[in-house]
């Protein structure tokens, strides 16, 4: 990042990589401490990094090896419950058909660990989490709680169990929702939940959360729900653009304008087949990745097995070439 030493820097909440580049990447050091690592400044980092987020809700820590995982057999009944929804693809109601299974799985995993919990308890916690803004103190408490749970210092709690259930069942969620699996008017409900579950289930490693907490305690990083950066600040946009924010002068926008690709009106994503070929547009054109997000769910994943479109496309090309 081309940011000089000692200015004030402001960035989006998906900014942990940028924060680490501006601190640890500039010869700052994290050393072993008691509960959290200590940070030794190099003098090359910004004076202060302000992270802007409208909701104030933070990313929570992923579990470490210190938390004993639930055996894969435990999740099978919930996978079966989701598979039972497959015949209704195109008519699925997100809360009734999918979200209720996730909450039941989370409650059962908590009960198995010794904390009697119902799916209603899980749903009420999630409503409370997603409904209100968090100030910096509340966000720090949530992060610290998630770090302690992820490292085995505290017993697992509802956000941990809910994140675990979402991760374990995510491949089936992707199958059910992708390619227009939800009924009319249901995508917004899914999108709102999925956005929050990114924070709860797919947050940074616990080690990174600990580093961020230390930087916050030392005043290097602060959280803000204000949208305007202070005068003179260097602004880093660390938020991934949405699928509908294609460069107006780029090739994708031109393809849309010419009608070579078709945009799904509900998700604003490019509509494609299971082999990536565009629907309702030019034959022989395939699109993969974030431009299809919403029509195809979960393109930002690091998993190589979650989506099969590229392999399917390669198979169709091989057939065309070799008969």
What residue ranges belong to the model's regions?
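Flavin (primarily FAD) cofactor-binding/catalytic cores of flavoenzymes
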Residues: 1-321
